[in-house]
Amino acid sequence: MQQITQDYLANKAKELLNSGICSRVFGWKRGEFDYDLTPAVFTTAEQIDREFVYNGFCAANFSKYLVNETRRDAGKVAVFLKPCDSYSFNQLLTEHRFDREKVYAVGIPCEGMTDINKVRQAVDGIAKLTFDENGNIIVETLYDGTATLDRNECMLERCIHCKSKRCVVYDELLGENGEVLDDSRFDEVKKLEAMTADERFAFWQGELSRCIRCNACRD
């Protein structure tokens, strides 16, 4: 599967703006920390060059943001959709939550996103985070120099149990589309069934506290 880099996506975003296909692009920009990436709307190539970021911490799902963004009378908005994002996009579209004609959807492949909590468990005193060409995490620490963490050991749980690498809706697809996976995600159900009532309550309390009602789980 083709690996999508930050430069590749940034150039695509500028191409969409310069060609007039869209008037703005949903992307990611850095927050206070290297792992604190947040959705942002880009309207110029200069803004993209200055602020656009794409790496293993870009787990944010843009689909829900389209509900409000497409209500603006400001032309078409382009959005990058990972396979899991495309499921929530499809569900929200089915529920008529946004105007499809106002969106240019670009499907992108994804090999899984990084869980900052797993990185924190592996190293202390994080000063700077970057990724190598294979997606492994390079951590500069305050106390113990630099550490390299295997991306597969620090992946988000939902990515470990990913149900599909296939984008189900798009106007343009970058790279090759993936496949629906025959994974072992129901192993997690067995773990839940083995929990006590209090443990299950605590588990779902933690899961639902992060819910943004993107509706990907309903598709």
What does each of the following model-derived ranges do?
Residues M1-L208, R218:
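Iron-sulfur-associated redox domains of electron-transfer enzymes in respiratory
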Residues I212:
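Helix-loop elements that line ligand-binding/catalytic pockets
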